[in-house]
Amino acid sequence: SPAEWAYERIIVYLKNFEEQLDNEHEVAMGFAGGDAGVLRIEGMGYFDPDVITFYGSEASGAKMQLIQHVSQLNVMLRALPKQLDQPEPNRIGFRLAADLENSVGSVKAKKKKKPR
């Protein structure tokens, strides 16, 4: 589906962006126009066939969620200082990429099983 395709590509971009960050920064999304500000990405998902969602929090800690149709998808990644109360930065791209690889691997493993 278009949503799944976009979801997988965004994960690749998130991971690549995070590979360039030092240990004091983590990835966030910036928004153009208005006072929407910056979303510290804590997760993302999709709803077939055509909706992507990002969720997390803003600088004050208030929860935020962006729900976006794939035809209007624009994502601006930004580096933010990691949260002071965390010893390590949140690497959402690495976590989502690992989850994606595990889910693809489990689907392949299920397909390879022979019926008894």
Language model regions located:
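Negatively charged, low-complexity tracts enriched in Asp/Glu with abundant Ser/Thr
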Residues: S1-G33
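Generic structural hydrophobic/aromatic packing signal, biased to beta-strands
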Residues: I10, M29-F31, I41, F54, ...
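Intrinsically disordered, low-complexity boundary segments flanking structured domains
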Residues: K15-E18, E42, S60-M64
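A generic structural signal for short, non-catalytic loop/turn and secondary-structure boundary residues
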Residues: D22, G34, F47, Q68-V70, ...
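Amphipathic, interaction-prone secondary-structure segments
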Residues: E26-G56
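Helix-rich interaction surfaces within compact, conserved domain-sized segments
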Residues: A62-R116
